[in-house]
Amino acid sequence: VIGTPLGESYPKENIELQAHIAKEHLLVSQVPVLRYAVQPFQHKRHYFPERNATMSALTEGTIIVEAGETSGTLTQARAALYQGRKLFILDSCFNNPAITWPARFEKEGAIRVRDSEDIWKALEPA
């Protein structure tokens, strides 16, 4: 899932990787080509939160290993909870005094991961 139209690569260094994924696997984008083309560069970053929500929608769960207080990863975390997907947060995030979001998301239904069994148990069919 990319945050640009299918014909664009960001960052440019990923052009070959993106072409390989498009040819051999599946490349997904919700970004409208014509609207993207006429927007100033500064506004194009606004498509990345949509990408994060799409990534959440295509999965059973999102695992957060590390994210700062203003990280775009938190957009995907919010989307996962809103979409009824599992949200897993590694225990190390809870032990970081520089961030407050892990406790907030845990109150909203995120699963604190102390070991891999926490993930496997949560993904078992009911």
Language model feature labels by segment:
Residues 1-126:
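Glycine-biased, small-residue-rich flexible motifs in mid-sequence functional cores and linkers
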